[in-house]
Amino acid sequence: MYSIVAEESGLLPRERLLQKGAEVLSDQELLAIVLRTGTRSESVLSMANRILKGMTSLADLSRLSLNELQEIPGIGRVKSIELKAMVELAKRIEKAELARSEQIMSSQQVARRMMLDIGDKPQEHLVAIYLDTQNRIIQQKTVFIGGVRRSIAEPREILYYACHLMATSLIVVHNHPSGEAYPSRNDIDFTQKIKRSCDDLGICLLDHLIVGKSTYYSFREEREDFEL
């Protein structure tokens, strides 16, 4: 269960933010500021406390749909929309921070980016990230949505865009809607096939990443020779 640390200073969250800064506020206080008001029978701090206690971690808030948010007692249509907008804005800020890096330096860097993009999608998304000679992103393209199985026999679409964009290397990423990131036999077969196709064209497959909601698997990191 989510752990709540009580603040006993007597100051309201907005007053504490003004006096001490947002970084010192607890999750409960920050959520109370976003919620703005409670109900006739419950203060906004108490409501924030109750919402957070019903979660295993703060990340759970980002996974709730509008309907699920509205099912929380005290959270109506307006508050659910505001919360959803806040979560989406936080995601976009994180993406913008990651995008500031001019070069892809590690698989972990890409995994963080893609967990935000597709980690919680209900369908499998197959994404190709095309890079130049400096490992800068030329383009990120969603190649397929639905199931990776059909894509296993069709690496040509991935490589078509690589040639069209004059990419020297690429990274392939797909998500597991289950949230788990361990590769299946199909994932391994697909990686072998796309790697061979890349080698034939002189394009470097830097990695194949599988992402879940909060975890990832890197074929390059987990398989030292990346020969499979």
From Swiss-Prot:
Alphabetical list of InterPro entries matching this protein: MPN, RadC_JAB, RuvA_2-like, UPF0758, UPF0758_CS, UPF0758_N
Motif mapping: JAMM motif: 174-187
Pfam annotation, one family: RadC
Binding site for Zn(2+): 174, 176, 187
Hydrolase found in the keyword field: yes
GO biological process: proteolysis
Record-stated family: Belongs to the UPF0758 family.
Tree of life domain: Bacteria
GO MF assignments: metal ion binding; metallopeptidase activity
Domain MPN, chain residue ranges per copy: 103-225
Protein name, as recorded: UPF0758 protein stu1465
Disulfide cross-links: none
